[in-house]
């Protein structure tokens, strides 16, 4: 048995996903979100056993969204405004508390195991949920506050190729090889499918 634990986490990026009138998506370029301290993943699944002839006969399963929870350094005010679905005044460099109108995004990050193997995880479409900001006075201790946000993923319409076929999928992940990071998760780069081909791009 080769015992492993998760140890290492970095490079949280996000890219805007635009949904057209026909429901088809296009992806923008990767942008830096914040320094990443912790990431948790919880699939929203449910199941129920159905009984026939006085015994449990079948199990019905259902799958909902997948929820990611991130603890990060404090993003820029503009980034916080964007993901919260508020309005950014670029002239005044000011966040406006307008009515919330959240956009879809893709997110990606790199995590590692204790042997140094790194993996990239690309979540293709979702919306940022609740964010948590807590402010505190400066005192004579090392007290500080981080930033917390959730991301609820859904399955995009685009079919992503794999194993000679294709399927709709919410995310993909794999161990990084030489040169992979520059292709799959690079600031200013395209959001790509499993093969490394760019997904439909926003003009």
Regions found by a protein language model. Give the residues of each.
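Long amphipathic alpha-helical segments
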Residues: 74-79, 86, 104-119, 156-159
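Mixed-charge, glycine-accented linear interaction segment located at domain edges/termini
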Residues: 126-203
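Catalytic micro-motifs at enzyme active sites that drive phosphoryl/nucleotidyl and oxygen chemistry
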Residues: 54-60, 93-97, 133-140
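Polar/acidic, low-complexity leader/linker segments enriched in S/T/G and N/D
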Residues: 1-40, 198, 202-203
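N-terminal "mature-chain" segments and other terminal, solvent-exposed stretches
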Residues: 43-53
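Charged, amphipathic alpha-helical segments
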Residues: 76-98
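Oligomerization/assembly interface segments of phage tail-like spikes and tubes
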Residues: 56-81, 143-156
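Short helix-loop boundary/capping segments
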Residues: 96-131, 136
């Amino acid at each position: 048995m080769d015992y492993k634990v998760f140890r290492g986490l970095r490079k949280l990026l996000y890219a805007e996903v635009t949904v057209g009138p026909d429901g088809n998506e296009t992806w923008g370029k990767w942008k830096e979100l914040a320094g990443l301290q912790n990431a948790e993943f919880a699939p929203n699944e449910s199941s129920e056993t159905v009984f026939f002839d006085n015994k449990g006969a079948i199990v019905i399963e259902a799958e909902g969204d997948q929820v990611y929870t991130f603890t990060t350094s404090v993003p820029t005010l503009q980034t916080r405004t964007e993901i919260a679905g508020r309005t950014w005044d670029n002239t005044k460099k000011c966040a406006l508390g307008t009515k919330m109108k959240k956009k879809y995004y893709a997110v990606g990050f790199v995590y590692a195991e204790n042997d140094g193997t790194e993996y990239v995880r690309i979540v293709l479409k979702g919306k940022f949920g609740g964010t948590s900001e807590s402010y505190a006075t400066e005192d004579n201790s090392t007290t500080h506050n981080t930033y917390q946000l959730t991301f609820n993923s859904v399955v995009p319409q685009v079919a992503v190729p794999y194993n000679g076929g294709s399927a709709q999928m919410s995310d993909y992940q794999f161990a990084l090889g030489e040169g992979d990071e520059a292709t799959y998760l690079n600031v200013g780069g395209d959001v790509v499918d499993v093969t490394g081909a760019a997904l439909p791009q926003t003009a």
